[in-house]
Amino acid sequence: MSAPTTIGFVGLGQMGEPMAAFIARGETPLICYDRVPGRAPEGAIETGELAEVIARADTIFLSLPDGKIVNAVAAEIAAMDDVAGKVIIDMSTIGPAAAKEAAATLTAAGMTFIDAPVSGGRQGALKASITIIWAGPQAEMARHRHIIDLFCANAFHVGDQPGQGQAVKLLNNFLSATAMAASSEAVLFGLAHGVDMKTILDVVKVSTGNNTAIEDKFPRRILTGSYDAGFFAELLNKDVRLYNQFVQEAGTSNLIGARVAEVWQQVEEALPPQSDFTRVFEVLEKRTLP
């Protein structure tokens, strides 16, 4: 199969904008659409019509907020003329059920759907250091590898079925959410005993309790007071809710997941909208005060 001749990109938000910017630096023409005008990166064609992206591109990347929006866009695309043979690569985090629904809609119209969420947050997207979790034909992954490598540091093929990419992404985000909340609680325990935060981090970083929160979020986002990891608390809470929903459907253990979901729901309720998820530390800190 030949490489795509034109790439489309739909959704230029927190993650989509930097990913599209790296694609625009490549050799394949890029056409972008977002409901907010003016977000297209330098080097890309911007259009105010989704239909123009679909008409001009043979591969279209999606980076959208949730499954409801992804499936609305999928239905709109499927109803357009001359879409057979096009490839839709959805990099949104929407859960297995929504991915399967989008796949059914688009494949019925003769298109190929790839379930390919990404991990690494906005900071990773800005550095092209994110990971793409690909569930779909390996041949399509190989055909698009030169595009993927423009904005991803890692690419994993996790299966051929829609929903498998979402499962891996959600379990990853659940682990990240758990590490962030548990580390915040543990650090507060150390602080209560008069140990300074940097010392706690230095010890744990080279011990068995190390994790990404201790390694990155605390020294770079919390100790500095910047709280700028680039991922909103409400979005992480959404992912934790999705994880718990599909754990229940799968019938696997949910003892820890249920409690973590309660914590992040409380965190979202305690913070203003679009607060960085690292501010979980501040929420828990306030709850430890007399």
Label the predicted regions.
Residues 1-63, 91, 122:
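NAD(P)+-binding Rossmann beta1-loop-alpha1 motif at the extreme N-terminus of oxidoreductases
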Residues 270-290:
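NAD(P)-dependent dehydrogenase/reductase Rossmann-like domain
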Residues 127-128, 132-135, 156, 162-193, ...:
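Active-site-proximal catalytic alpha-helix in oxidoreductases
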Residues 50-112:
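Rossmann-fold NAD(P) dinucleotide-binding segment
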Residues 93-173:
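Rossmann-fold dinucleotide-binding core
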Residues 166, 175, 213-275:
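Interdomain hinge/lid region at the active-site interface
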